[in-house]
Amino acid sequence: MAKRKIVKKKVVRKSIAKGIVYISATFNNTMVTVTDEMGNAIAWSSAGGLGFKGSKKSTPYAAQQAVEDALNKAKEHGIKEVGIKVQGPGSGRETAVKSVGAVEGIKVTFLKDITPLAHNGCRPPKRRRV
């Protein structure tokens, strides 16, 4: 009996000019996702995924590194213009937004805060006592 040949499909990368950078800055981590205009993910990165552990994940420097990593991956797909959507109260939020504008060859078109605000919904967690 003859053996079957395994045929590998070639990976076709689409050239995408415009995209959206979603920055989710929580108290413990910062996640960055680059999508096309339809919302399909192109590249992503997070502070924890880059090797920052524990309390170092929530630092502004870790957020900056996560943004640079995600945008460098997205540049391979031909991204030239991005809009920024920021969510969450984290400490890396401002630094992440600034570092998107600092990346070479990428133009920022808009900046929007999409943090969900409760209209007297769920009761918030109790205050910490240290």
UniProtKB/Swiss-Prot annotation:
Q: Which gene encodes it?
A: rpsK
Q: Which domain of life is it from?
A: Bacteria
- Show the coiled coil region(s): none
Q: Which GO terms describe its biological process?
A: translation
Protein name per the record: Small ribosomal subunit protein uS11
Xref: InterPro entries: Ribosomal_uS11, Ribosomal_uS11_bac-type, Ribosomal_uS11_CS, Ribosomal_uS11_sf
PANTHER family referenced in this protein's UniProt entry, alphabetically: 40S RIBOSOMAL PROTEIN S14/30S RIBOSOMAL PROTEIN S11 (PTHR11759)
User: What Gene3D superfamilies does its record include?
Assistant: Ribosomal protein S11 (3.30.420.80)
Organism equals: Campylobacter curvus (strain 525.92)
Any GO MF annotation of the entry: structural constituent of ribosome
State the similarity comment: Belongs to the universal ribosomal protein uS11 family.
Short name of any one Pfam family annotated for the protein: Ribosomal_S11
What interactions and quaternary structure are annotated?
A: Part of the 30S ribosomal subunit. Interacts with proteins S7 and S18. Binds to IF-3.
Q: What does this protein do?
A: Located on the platform of the 30S subunit, it bridges several disparate RNA helices of the 16S rRNA. Forms part of the Shine-Dalgarno cleft in the 70S ribosome.
Q: List the disulfide bonds.
A: none
Which UniProt key words apply to this protein? Ribonucleoprotein, Ribosomal protein, RNA-binding, rRNA-binding
**One Gene Ontology cellular component annotation held by this UniProt entry:** ribonucleoprotein complex
